[in-house]
């Protein structure tokens, strides 16, 4: 039985603790309509309120905590003892295992409260996008928990790479479409330009928003926006308590970054509590937003339906290559994380997928867990930091977020295995 007392009672909001004020969302100067006002039409009211709050702690509704218990919160904090032995490092390595949830990733942590707030409003149908499929799976399950219908626009390349993700979303009751689709004006425009377009998170996001608007449904946000990172803070809040129970003080905290929700949810409570000496955000070298992106106002979605936010971005029209870590195929970085990177509070790394594949294999062989390709990016940075501790003869405590398992990503693993090991 899960002890509900171990589940956090509050979400943590980093905005009051940022080193400087967060540049606010804004409408484009030549806008025909207000994108900020548009949010009122597509987001559940409480989700919108939380998006703009400056409160440090937000009480988690008891109904949401009940659902958190059902999905297995708190998730385990585990020590990677065999990985330590394999690397012959003096460092201790711990990981928070979000793959222990029914949907296999951290995404359910915000899907549940967003679906709850929609249901409380009397909404009957929710819409979203998904890249690798973890977010869509989480929304389909969360919607079913509150008797809501759901529609999910899945990036085409992932839709084709991961048919089992589509299956599980449909088993949970969701309707899944490969984006770009002919269901929206924006999708039809993209398909007219390129009938074989692989899709992107930005495009799928635009389709989901347009679809929600046209049908008076509500849109659920999967990453990037502040409210998502707020809900994901349960990861870091739990991890702090679990490390305290072990008497451990973390030196280095690491997570992968697509839009930033799992990294922010994991590290922000540590940053706010001034725990840890180094925070490392890890991205894909094939989507080089950390190394070549600009810090400027840009649209989170490709069609430009959402308000402009200041973030590190490759540009809303950037089409990411079809790498095996589909959840990292996004052009931008959450505004709060972008600010922390620009202020040099958070460091970044970018790795090629061949390096990630080798790191994932080491983790599988030592710890027995198949990591999601996205999460394997964090593992590569962990290995590098552990070997650095070995070289410098330092007994560091490294903690990372294993944001999901890869048991539904085996097709992607097989694809890269054929390329790398041919």
From Swiss-Prot:
The keyword Amino-acid biosynthesis applies. GO terms for molecular function: L-serine hydro-lyase (adding indole, L-tryptophan-forming) activity; pyridoxal phosphate binding; tryptophan synthase activity. HAMAP family: Trp_synth_beta (MF_00133). This is Tryptophan synthase beta chain 1. The beta subunit is responsible for the synthesis of L-tryptophan from indole and L-serine. It comes from Sulfurisphaera tokodaii (strain DSM 16993 / JCM 10545 / NBRC 100140 / 7) (Sulfolobus tokodaii). GO terms for cellular component: cytoplasm. Tetramer of two alpha and two beta chains. The modification N6-(pyridoxal phosphate)lysine is found at residue 107. The gene is trpB1. InterPro entries: Trp_synth_b-like, Trp_synth_b_CS, Trp_synth_beta, Trp_synth_beta/beta-like, TrpB-like_PALP, TrpB-like_PALP_sf. Belongs to the TrpB family. The keyword Lyase applies.
